[in-house]
C-alpha cells in the first residue's frame, strides 16, 4: 500500500544502458489524493525497462500514467482517474487474465476503466493490436500509434467515443488503421481519426435509420457506418450522387455490411450504392446479395468512379446487369 495525501506518486527506474533495464511492479494498492482530486497524479515509468501492472491505482479525479519500453497490464488491475495514459513501444490488447505477458494490456481492464468514468489513451511508438473485443458505454478511448492500428476484434461503443491516431512516428507516411473486424457505433457516439500531421477528422456516425438521408443531404461529408444494414423490399433505391451532383466525401464502413440492396433502373446511367464518385474515398464495407440493374456505368458499390477516387478493403456479392461499363464492384 502506497498513499500520498499530497496528491502525487512517481515510481520510476532509469537504466544507463540495455544491460541495466529497470522493472516497475504494481500488484498492491497505490493511492494519491489531493484536496480537490483534480491534481491527483500517479506515474509508473520504467525507463527502457518493464512496467508490470496487476493491482489498484487510484488517482480519483486526476491522472494516471503507466509507461515502459515493455508494459504489461492484466485484467486484475483497477484504475481510477479522470485520464489514464498507457505508453509502451508496442501494445497488444488481449484477454490478459492474471498472467503478465510482453507488451499486453487486458481488454477487460480497459472497458471497466472507461465505464467507471476514466478516459483511456493507449499510446505506442510502433503498432497497436486490438486482439480482444472491447465494449464500453461512456468516455473516450484513444488509440495513438506511431505506425499502424490493427483492429482484429470488434470494438463496441454504445456511449462516449473512439479516437484513432496513427502514423505519428516522425516521417511515417504509410501508417494506417486497419479494420479486420467491426467497429460498432451507436448514434450519438463520436468517431475521430488523425493521420500523422494531418488535421483531425470528426466523422458523422450513420446507421440504418439515417444512412441515406444524411449522405444524400451532404455529399462532401465524412461518414462512418456504425452498424450492419439490411434493406428489405426496396427496389427504388436512388444512387447517392449523380453526374451533376457527385459524391466527393469519405465513407468508411468500419467492417460492416449492407445487405439486399436492390436497384431496378434499366434505362438509367450511373447506378450503384453510390452513383457518381468524384475524388471520393470508400473503404471497409461489404455489399451482400445486391441486385443492381442500370444502363451504363453500373456497379454494386459505385457506378462511375473518377478523379482519383479510392476504394479499399471492400467487396460485393450479388447480380449486376446493364448494357455498357458494368462491373461487380465498380462499373467504370
Predicted regions and their residues:
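Extracellular and secretory-pathway beta-repeat/beta-biased strand scaffolds
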Residues: 1-203, 209-218, 258
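Predominantly extracellular beta-rich ligand-binding scaffolds that present long acidic/polar faces
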Residues: 154-332
Amino acid at each position: 500500500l502506497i498513499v500520498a495525501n499530497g496528491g502525487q506518486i512517481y515510481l520510476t527506474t532509469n537504466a544507463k544502458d540495455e544491460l541495466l533495464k529497470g522493472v516497475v511492479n504494481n500488484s498492491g494498492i497505490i493511492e494519491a489524493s489531493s484536496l480537490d482530486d483534480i491534481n491527483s497524479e500517479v506515474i509508473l515509468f520504467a525507463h527502457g525497462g518493464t512496467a508490470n501492472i496487476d493491482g489498484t491505482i487510484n488517482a480519483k479525479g486526476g491522472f494516471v500514467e503507466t509507461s515502459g519500453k515493455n508494459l504489461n497490464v492484466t485484467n486484475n488491475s483497477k484504475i481510477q482517474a479522470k485520464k489514464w495514459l498507457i505508453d509502451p513501444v508496442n501494445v497488444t490488447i488481449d484477454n490478459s487474465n492474471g498472467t503478465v505477458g510482453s507488451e499486453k494490456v487486458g481488454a477487460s481492464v480497459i472497458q471497466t476503466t472507461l465505464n467507471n468514468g476514466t478516459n483511456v489513451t493507449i499510446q505506442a511508438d510502433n503498432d497497436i493490436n486490438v486482439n480482444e473485443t472491447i465494449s464500453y458505454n461512456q468516455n473516450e478511448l484513444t488509440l495513438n500509434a506511431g505506425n499502424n492500428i490493427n483492429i482484429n476484434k470488434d470494438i463496441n461503443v454504445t456511449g462516449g467515443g473512439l479516437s484513432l491516431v496513427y502514423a505519428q512516428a516522425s516521417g511515417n507516411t504509410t501508417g494506417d488503421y486497419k479494420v479486420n473486424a467491426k467497429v460498432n457505433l451507436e448514434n450519438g457516439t463520436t468517431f475521430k481519426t488523425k493521420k500523422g500531421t494531418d488535421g483531425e477528422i470528426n466523422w458523422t456516425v450513420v446507421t440504418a435509420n439515417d444512412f441515406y438521408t444524411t449522405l444524400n443531404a451532404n455529399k462532401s461529408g465524412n461518414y462512418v457506418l456504425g452498424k450492419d444494414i439490411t434493406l428489405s423490399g426496396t427496389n427504388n433505391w436512388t444512387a447517392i450522387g449523380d453526374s451533376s451532383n457527385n459524391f466527393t466525401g469519405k465513407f468508411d464502413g468500419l467492417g460492416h455490411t449492407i445487405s439486399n440492396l436492390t436497384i431496378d433502373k434499366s434505362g438509367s446511367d450511373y447506378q450503384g450504392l453510390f452513383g457518381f464518385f468524384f475524388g471520393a474515398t470508400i473503404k471497409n464495407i461489404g455489399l451482400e446479395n445486391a441486385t443492381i440493374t442500370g444502363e451504363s456505368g453500373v456497379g454494386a458499390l459505385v457506378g462511375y468512379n473518377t478523379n482519383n477516387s479510392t476504394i479499399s478493403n471492400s467487396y460485393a456479392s450479388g447480380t449486376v446487369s446493364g448494357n455498357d461499363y458494368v462491373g461487380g464492384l465498380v462499373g467504370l
